[in-house]
Regions:
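PLP-dependent amino-acid enzyme catalytic core
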Residues: 2-175
Length: 175
């Protein structure tokens, strides 16, 4: 079954899809932390697909990824609501770096679980933004499973990449 034919997946998709108002609100929150990123014509891509094609240069953000947008929209909502005083997440890189950046900006403690073989460059980026790192599991799924089972993380709110409407609304501001 695809998302279009599976009623459960379709319902989840519709629940996460931001409204125009949520996207505008997210854009306002994010604008305090991220400069606009340019779109550039990609001549090679144009040649290959036969039409004008532009790419968005999200790699110039401090996180070097569009994922900063979602994290920067989620974290202040959690902080203001008092929903969590400590966060945790599992990542192989970009999501962890984005959450680390946002949590640093909002002074919210974060623990990022990464697989033991995680890329050193990504690990350094996560660490540079001040998150506590835990090397757990051999892959992302195993890392998540360990974190969700380990009582050491029971006092944290676990953030799954892409599973929050605030994350999706933040990401929708890329346009």
């Amino acid at each position: 079954m695809t998302a279009e034919t599976d009623p459960i997946k379709l319902k989840c998709y519709k629940m996460l899809q931001p409204t125009p108002e949520q996207s505008v609100s997210a854009s306002q929150v994010i604008s305090d932390y991220l400069d606009p990123t340019p779109m550039v014509l990609n001549k090679e891509l144009c040649r290959r697909i036969g039409t004008k094609s532009y790419v968005k240069c999200e790699y110039i953000s401090p996180v070097r990824s569009f994922k900063a947008r979602g994290a920067l929209n989620l974290v202040p909502h959690l902080k203001v609501s008092g929903e969590a005083s400590r966060l945790s997440t599992a990542s192989t890189g970009n999501h962890g770096a984005a959450m680390s950046f946002a949590c640093q900006e909002y002074s919210l403690p974060l623990t990022v679980g990464v697989p033991v073989n995680a890329d050193d460059t990504k690990v350094s980026l996560i660490k540079n933004f001040g998150a506590r790192l835990e090397f757990l599991g051999n892959d992302l799924d195993e890392t998540k499973e360990i974190m969700l089972q380990d009582t050491a993380f029971k006092e944290t709110l676990f953030i799954e990449d892409g599973s929050s409407q605030d994350i999706v609304a933040g990401t929708s501001t890329i346009g």
